[in-house]
Amino acid sequence: MAAAGRSALAIDFVGGAVGYKLRSGAARSHALLKATGMAPGRALQVIDATAGLGRDAFLLASMGASVTLIERSPQVHALLAQGLAAAQAESAELAGVVARMTLIQGDARDLLPTLQADVVTVDPMHPERTKTALVKQEMRLLRDLVGADPDVCELMQAALSARCGRVVLKWPLRAEPLAGVRKPSYQIAGKTVRYDVFVLPRGAAEERAPGADAALNP
């Protein structure tokens, strides 16, 4: 629950940062698209193993991907469902985006072995920064609600064992690699985060992404 005197956590796909990126066209240059291998005319099947606020999943769906969102927190799952319903009712365009999104409540470690996709994305709760004021309020509220992700290494191992062609880990730009997780095939850096891309045997024939390690929008 949010602490007294603080705004309650809400998920909004119509306004805010998500709406701005879609309206301005900024979404098309997002580093996540390059990390996942999104390209014009290429409709990917994506599993978002850590749905959270749902922004990355909505971005991918807005670019044409079919996205399965997995969220283990019942409270966050309910907020996501409300946000998606509001977006669906807002306009035909947003309803089309929502139609490409499937929301599941559960633990991705248990669900990933039962699913198949082109890409699995993992965006765990990031380590707390020393200067906590730099963390956006909504992320503080989310952390207060769901806590840390002490099992992120287990989740990554489940993702790397999934039936998919690549796994994309979203991680703070200058954070140390996750202990016990193999070295990524390559990295794509944003302003504050990086995308560690693991190309798996199913996707081994894919060429190294052009401009890997280049800075794009986070």
Swiss-Prot record:
Keyword Methyltransferase recorded: yes
Subcellular location: Cytoplasm
Pfam families in the record: SAM_MT (PF04445)
Residue sites binding S-adenosyl-L-methionine per the record: R55, D56, E71, R72, D123
Main location as per UniProt: cytoplasm
Keyword vocabulary terms for this entry: Cytoplasm, Methyltransferase, rRNA processing, S-adenosyl-L-methionine, Transferase
Gene Ontology CC entries for this record: cytoplasm
This protein's record includes keyword Mitochondrion: no
Documented EC number(s): 2.1.1.242
Similarity comment text for this entry: Belongs to the methyltransferase superfamily. RsmJ family.
PANTHER family: RIBOSOMAL RNA SMALL SUBUNIT METHYLTRANSFERASE J
Identification of the protein by name: Ribosomal RNA small subunit methyltransferase J
Upper lineage: Bacteria, Pseudomonadati, Pseudomonadota, Alphaproteobacteria, Hyphomicrobiales
